[in-house]
Every structure is written in structure tokens, then in C-alpha cells.
């Protein structure tokens, strides 16, 4: 990520404003940096090149992620401002808004290299927003979700963009699961960075330049949380409190699950289940892929190949199996299909920005996709599972 002709950077500091738990820095060219104390160990950094911040909203954060802090003090120095919690020191340069972060023992945990900068993208009508940081000698990096690479991500570049990549090989990227959170570990300590941006994002862990780690996005904001901790486990715990903890999984979900693409009939499913029991292979669940459906229509059964799903599920239950049936949120465009008709009439499907319904190719062919943004669509969708639950799923 070398410097490009149309890359832009913050100018020298113009003014500073205090807003409760946030300090806002304004540069002469309109760039803004908001530093927020989320907890004593967690700071949020939010940048804008537009002279204002868009409405603050995130799907990722837990409702109670702001769990309080003892204090957040600001002190002006000759060339910097120092922002302090009991556990962190954040130093902001007046020259460039670059940031350095220190632990409670004064050890340097993380610091900007170029810091925040952006590239104008006339094709998308938005900015490519970027952040580059110094990479310490011997620093290790972990995280990001599904990455078919080394555990330590140093010397690699990745992108996060959910992609259907069955049968992938080593170093294939991007893949299915994308989590814009990574750990940094070096001799001075450890930390985590959560990049809260829903655009296509990229992470370069000292790949292009050996002493620099960068992350950037094709739109939105540089909006990240810096999480300090005495250990990686400690950082993980604070990250979990920030974004929310999942429900405790049932014990059976931790066992062996039999899954493949795909079982074509009820008879085949029962043959597999019987064989697993005959061979005494401990198995807690068996999966039904798309072939159980009628023409790949969600929330339906193929009555020819799965003539009695309720009896099948109950028999599997007697044998000690949980039944897990796939549901893809791609709804076949067919007004004789009740899910499509209902979603269409209630205006629950995704649309293009200029109004027409979005159509995408999924297993049945052309499909509509539910717009899960409104709560009423999520409630409708969850209610569609009732018939399957009644069948014993």
C-alpha cells in the first residue's frame, strides 16, 4: 500500500473539543478524529474526512458494551495531547493526528505509521479509507475468522468479503466467515483491534512493507476499537464483552455431526444413521442439505423423496440424533410459492437503491432475498421455522 498521488492525510491540528467520554480533534483540512473511552482498557478511534460524522450505528456492538471507566483525562503538551485512563495512555500528535498507545506500565503497545489517510474513489463515489500502523520486530498476528493460511498471519494479506468457496485450498481468500478483529502480540505486550466497518475490508500484516501493518475499506469510516490486555485471553474476554457473548451452546452441539452435500432421500438418511449406530461411531446430529426441499424452496419438503419427514425426524430422535436442516435465505421467485408470495406482498425483500427488487442466483435459480434490517422482517422469518419445529426438527 504505497503512497498514491490521490492519497490524502490530516493537516495540522486546529482545535480540540471534549464531549463527556469522547475527545474530538479537528484538523485544518476538515479531518476529524474522535477518541472515546469505552472502558479503562478499551478506546474507540473514529475518523472522518468529511468535516462531520455520520450517524453512529453498528450491528456489531453489544447493547451494554460501554461498561464505564474510572476517568478519562486530557493533557496538552508542546507537540501532542495525552489522553489517559487508569490502564491506557493515548498520545495524539498535533502535526498529523497520529496515535501512539501505551500500557499502564508505560510500554508501547501500538502506534500509527502513516496513520489515517484516504484515497478518493470516483467510481464508487466514496473514499477508500486506510489506517497503517508500525509492525514491531517479531510481532505476531492472529484472527480474522476463516483464513486458510498460517496461524500467525504475519507476511500475509487478506480481504474480508463473504464468499462461497467450497473445496478451497491453502491460502485461498476470501472465504465464508469474516471477522474484522485481530490480535497483535510482541515483546512489549498484546492487544486487539476490531475494525467496525461493513464494506469490503483488507488487512496487510507486514506483507507489502515489512515494518508496517495496514487495514482499509472500500467505503465507510475508519472506526476501530483498541483493546488492551495482560494476555490474549484477557483481550478476547474484553472483545466478547464489546461485541456480545453468544448463548451457551447445548452439549450435543459439541459432538460429532454427520454432514455432507447431500442426502437425496429419506431412505439414504436412515441408512447412514443406522450404519453410524451399527459401527458405534458416536454421532449427535445428522444434516439435511438442499435436496430435502421441493425444488430448493425453503421451508418445504420433497414429498417424493422425503414422504414422511415427521416420522423420519422422530425416528432419528429415538436413535439419538438431532436433525439439522439447511435454510438458505434465497427465496425462489414463484408467486405460487407461499413464502415468496407472502414476502412480496409484505414488501420484505431487498431492493436496489433506485427501487426495483434485487434478484440473485441461488439454488432454485432467480431468488428474492429478505431484507433483515427491519425487525418485522426478522420476526416474520423466524416464524417460518414453526412448521419445521412442529415436525420435530
Give each language-model segment a name.
Residues 23:
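Long, low-complexity, charge-dense
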Residues 57-62, 85-88, 257:
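Domain-wide signal for the mature, well-folded portions of proteins, strongly enriched
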Residues 1-16, 20, 36-81:
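A low-complexity, Ser/Thr/Gly/Pro-enriched, surface-exposed linker/loop concept
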Residues 26-28, 36, 66-250, 260-261, ...:
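Catalytic and substrate-binding clefts that recognize carbohydrates or anionic sugar/phosphate headgroups
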Residues 247-393:
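Aromatic-lined carbohydrate-binding/catalytic grooves of carbohydrate-active enzymes
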